[in-house]
Structures are given as structure tokens and as C-alpha cells.
């Protein structure tokens, strides 16, 4: 909705990493191992990808970050780079709900169609509605991995709420 209303791109570090993984790039292979274990890809890699992306022409009138920044170092790097943010939104969801939503997700790899075992189940359990092919659970959607990711969030990302609430001056979200 926001991207369409303002004619700006959504910048998702997760999507960028998944594309690198799918392409089998060295970054993608390194990222896959870290993500599958529930960890976060190194800040320098993410920051470099984001800086490169926001320098592209379609970002000249703005952009919407999705899932970025995730660490204090990433947030500080964006401020140091002179990137002004108009707003920062925190969506607060209980861990139990996140675990349920993510671990219930199933994907048809060839098309990208996404289902959920409870909220949007396929007509036939474990099968894509269109092709009848198998659905998979991504490694990063497995319950234990989601719980590890949440622990990392609480340790590394929650501090951003405080960081942005205290940010003053020209780089503070308006």
C-alpha cells in the first residue's frame, strides 16, 4: 500500500538475500548457512547491500525499508551515511504468535505461492492448489530456527526502539 501510494520501492534485505541464495552467489551461500541456523548476516554485508540499493535511480524519491535496520550498527551506519528517515514503525507481536505464523508457513518453490497450515491452508494438505506439487517449509521457518531468530531479535534489534526514540537533529525520524 505505502509503496504504491508514493511510487517508491520496498527494500527488503530478506528478499535481497533470498535472491543471492537462489542465484548461488558466494554471498548467497554464506548467507544461507547463517540464516538456516537462525542467525543474522554480518552487518557489513547488509549495510553494503542497502547502500548500493538505495543509490539506484528508483530510490531517488524515497523508499520503504522492510526488515532493516536490524542491529544498532546498521542503524548507526544509515545515520552516518546521511540517510534521513521520515518514520520508523515498530510492529509489536507476541513471540508465540510469530512462532505460530512463521512455523505454519508453507511455500510452493516454483511459483512462490505461500500458504499457512491454519490461516490459509491449501485445498489438499501439503500440495499446491494450482499444480498439486509438494509444498515445503523453508528452513528459516522451522520452529526452532524461528525461536533462535526471536532470541537474536530481543538481543540485537529491540535496542533500536530506544535508539530511534532518542535520535535528535536532522536525521531523526519526523
UniProtKB/Swiss-Prot annotation:
GO cellular component, one term: cytoplasm
Swiss-Prot/TrEMBL keywords: ATP-binding, Cytoplasm, Kinase, Nucleotide biosynthesis, Nucleotide-binding, Transferase
Ranges for region LID: 104-141
Keyword Manganese in record: no
Region (NMP): 12-41
Gene Ontology MF terms: adenylate kinase activity; ATP binding
Top enzyme class: transferase
Record-linked PROSITE patterns: ADENYLATE_KINASE
Keyword Metal-binding attached: no
Any single biological process term in GO: AMP salvage
Assembly and interaction partners: Monomer.
Domain notes: Consists of three domains, a large central CORE domain and two small peripheral domains, NMPbind and LID, which undergo movements during catalysis. The LID domain closes over the site of phosphoryl transfer upon ATP binding. Assembling and dissambling the active center during each catalytic cycle provides an effective means to prevent ATP hydrolysis.
The family this protein is said to belong to: Belongs to the adenylate kinase family.
Alphabetical list of HAMAP family matching this protein: Adenylate_kinase_Adk
Protein name stated in the entry: Adenylate kinase
The species this protein was found in: Neisseria flavescens
Gene: adk
Amino acid at each position: 500500500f505505502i509503496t504504491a501510494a508514493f511510487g517508491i520501492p520496498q527494500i527488503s534485505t530478506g528478499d535481497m538475500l533470498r535472491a543471492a541464495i537462489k542465484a548461488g552467489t558466494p554471498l548467497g551461500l554464506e548467507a544461507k548457512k547463517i540464516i538456516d541456523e537462525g542467525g543474522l548476516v554480518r552487518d557489513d554485508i547488509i549495510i553494503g547491500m542497502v547502500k548500493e540499493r538505495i543509490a539506484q535511480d528508483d530510490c531517488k524519491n524515497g523508499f520503504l525499508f522492510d526488515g532493516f535496520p536490524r542491529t544498532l550498527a546498521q542503524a548507526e551506519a544509515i545515520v552516518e551515511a546521511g540517510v534521513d528517515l521520515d518514520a520508523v514503525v515498530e510492529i509489536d507481536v507476541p513471540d508465540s504468535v510469530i512462532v505460530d505464523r512463521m512455523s505454519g508457513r508453507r511455500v510452493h518453490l516454483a511459483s512462490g505461492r505461500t500458504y499457512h497450515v491454519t490461516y490459509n491452508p491449501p485445498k489438499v494438505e501439503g500440495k499446491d492448489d494450482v499444480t498439486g506439487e509438494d509444498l515445503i517449509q523453508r528452513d528459516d521457518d522451522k520452529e526452532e530456527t524461528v525461536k533462535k531468530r526471536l532470541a537474536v531479535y530481543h538481543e540485537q534489534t529491540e535496542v533500536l526502539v530506544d535508539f530511534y526514540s532518542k535520535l535528535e537533529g536532522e536525521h531523526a525520524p519526523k
